[in-house]
Swiss-Prot record:
Keyword Membrane: no
Region: Disordered, residue numbers: 1-24
Organism: Oryza sativa subsp. indica
Cofactor binding summary note: Binds 2 magnesium ions per subunit.
Gene name of the encoded protein: ITPK1
Biological process according to GO: inositol trisphosphate metabolic process
Binding site for 1D-myo-inositol 1,3,4-trisphosphate: K53, K95, H191, K223, N320
Catalytic activity: 1D-myo-inositol 3,4,5,6-tetrakisphosphate + ATP = 1D-myo-inositol 1,3,4,5,6-pentakisphosphate + ADP + H(+); 1D-myo-inositol 1,3,4-trisphosphate + ATP = 1D-myo-inositol 1,3,4,5-tetrakisphosphate + ADP + H(+); 1D-myo-inositol 1,3,4-trisphosphate + ATP = 1D-myo-inositol 1,3,4,6-tetrakisphosphate + ADP + H(+)
Binding-site list for Mg(2+) 2: D318, N320
Residue ranges with Basic and acidic residues bias: 1-16
Protein family: Belongs to the ITPK1 family.
Purpose of the protein: Kinase that can phosphorylate various inositol polyphosphate such as Ins(3,4,5,6)P4 or Ins(1,3,4)P3 and participates in phytic acid biosynthesis in developing seeds. Phytic acid is the primary storage form of phosphorus in cereal grains and other plant seeds.
Residues reported to bind Mg(2+) 1: D303, D318
Protein name, as recorded: Inositol-tetrakisphosphate 1-kinase 1
Any one GO cellular component localisation term in the record: cytoplasm
């Protein structure tokens, strides 16, 4: 299994983002796969149905330039026209949450099994609800010599904010609690979170939502990106730890548009090596492989934290489909290699007659 690291572009990135590449299995070389495309005598056509914001962040000039060199052509899909009248496509990339579009894509998959859809709409739906999002991690019950992977204890609140304090007490959850919107629909609002320190502030929250026990983790979060058979780990600052003083002197709700907005105060902080140390590679390899299989997805990331004071206990706190790969160092080469590997696998199946 090939494992290598990329050097940071500058000293600041070296502190803020510590990338690490881990193929889950030995991938084909880009040159070998590009040769398959050449032998097939055709371009690889990738149709995409993405929001304008996603197009801007993902289809960056460097990615498009590299794609052209590898005979990969990205084509925008017109949602107002029948999908069957467009293309033909070899691969379809999508991240639209409209239910009508999801059904169109499901119908297209049945009619055109030769087209690779990234990813199946029915598999993506699993990540649109935070009640079910982490269930596969919990069911995995991953524990080995390298560590233990858990999920925070959580509670779903559908309505009636006034009932939240009693529901929390009945469930036995320990404050502080992180509140997240129940539904993940791709909007910025669905990534907002709130931190509640005391029971009396819970009724100020806005259901439907998920309440998760806050786990002190040294203010460091590990973003683990999955692209097919490869994963990349990026270390980032997160919400700071909560202490007794915080619990005794904060009685409101602290709201953050997203975790990254809560990290500004930690940008210049010195990072304790024991806190910043990346999770063990074998543990991430196992977790990435199992989640890929259980979720039925090839493009996702998950947020992972290490419990402060517990070197071998980790928590997965969120999973996202088709995340912001544009923020991942070196994503262009990783993604192009992934697309080419899909072609090679398809070509091998044709040769074998399967």
């Amino acid at each position: 299994m090939r494992v290598h690291e990329e050097a940071s572009e500058d000293k600041e990135r070296e502190v803020e983002e510590a990338p690490d590449l881990m193929p889950l299995s030995p991938p084909p070389t880009a040159a070998a796969t590009a040769a398959v495309v050449a032998v097939a005598g055709q371009r690889l056509v990738v149709g995409y149905a993405l929001t304008k914001k996603k197009v801007k962040s993902f289809l960056q000039p460097k990615l498009l330039s590299l794609a052209r060199k590898k005979s990969i052509h990205f084509v925008s899909i017109d949602e107002t026209r029948p999908l069957s009248e467009q293309g033909p496509f070899d691969i379809i990339l999508h991240k639209l949450t409209d239910k009508e579009w999801q059904q169109v894509l499901e119908d297209y998959r049945e009619e055109h099994p030769e087209v690779t859809v990234l990813d199946p709409p029915n598999a993506i739906q699993h990540l649109h609800n935070r009640q079910s999002m982490l269930q596969e991690v919990a069911d995995l019950n991953l524990s080995n010599a390298y560590g233990e992977v858990c999920t925070p204890r959580q509670l779903v609140i559908m309505k009636d904010p006034l009932s939240i304090p009693s529901a929390v007490a009945k469930a036995g959850l320990t404050l502080p609690l992180v509140a997240k919107p129940l539904v993940v629909d791709g909007t910025s609002k669905s990534h907002e979170l709130s931190l509640a320190y005391v029971e009396t502030s819970l009724s100020m929250l806005d259901p439907p939502l998920v309440l998760q026990e806050f786990v002190n983790h040294g203010g460091i979060l590990f973003k683990v990106y999955v692209v097919g058979e490869t994963i990349r780990v990026v270390r980032r600052f997160s919400l700071p730890d909560v202490n007794i003083y915080d619990l005794e002197n904060n009685d409101g709700i602290f709201r953050f548009p997203r975790v990254s907005c809560a990290t500004n105060t930690a940008e210049d902080a010195e990072v304790d090596p024991s806190i910043a140390e990346l999770p063990p590679k074998p543990l991430l390899e196992k977790l990435g492989r199992e989640l890929r299989r259980r979720l039925g997805l090839r493009l996702f990331n998950f947020d992972m934290i290490r419990e402060h004071g517990r070197k071998d206990r980790y928590y997965v706190i969120d999973i996202n489909y088709f995340p912001g790969y544009g923020k991942m160092p070196g994503y262009e080469h990783i993604f192009i290699d992934f697309l080419l590997s899909l072609v090679q696998n398809k070509y091998k199946r044709r040769l074998s007659g399967s």
